[in-house]
Amino acid sequence: VQDTNNQRNYMFERLDLGVGETVYGLGERFTALVRNGQTVETWNRDGGTSTEQAYKNIPFYMTNRGYGVLVNHPQCVSFEVGSEKVSKVQFSVESEYLEYFVIDGPTPKAVLDRYTRFTGRPALPPAWSFGLWLTTSFTTNYDEATVNSFIDGMAERNLPLHVFHFDCFWMKAFQWCDFEWDPLTFPDPEGMIRRLKAKGLKICVWINPYIGQKSPVFKELQEKGYLLKRPDGSLWQWDKWQPGL
């Protein structure tokens, strides 16, 4: 199909949904577990849990009829799961080709087994990583006392805890991500981590592959050519999360 307005080419497929057939999958979503009635775009975006956007989109779904479908496409795939027509799953891509695989079961476990054998299986993470994690999340003003209050709150509620995660403000604001603890709020990070580990916790910190212009190391990275550049040789920057990212 060609969009006559912009001359872009699209390919799509429609597969039948039986009466009572329910669809699951398509990666991380913050909507209903059953995907029927939803329109899903498998394009990674940082939208938060109150939106239909997600970090971990996967163009694979399975149904309670004992099969799965994997759309093998590296770009955005749009799924209409019984939303345009209740008896159809439609998926489309902006391309001149469309490749997909139907994976038989007959059970959900068998579908997932064949799917992961086909796509490849990652190494098994350590056992502790499957435990309960607690994060500072969007807390923007916190220190060791705040962290301990969160951890103590879990203990008071008799909730197990295995990993504590420091969100972005363990570093100085708008200097993300230079791997430097904010000395005002965390003057003794090594000691703090030892104290947290003494409680039997694993520690995780928030990082991302970018650096803010406000960080003291930005100039050094720029001079040494470590930063991403545009085709014309200029530095690639934007202001989405912080100035001069």
Where are these regions (language model features)?
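Catalytic and substrate-binding clefts that recognize carbohydrates or anionic sugar/phosphate headgroups
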Residues: 1-127, 135-138, 144-145, 149-156
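Aromatic-lined carbohydrate-binding/catalytic grooves of carbohydrate-active enzymes
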Residues: 123-245
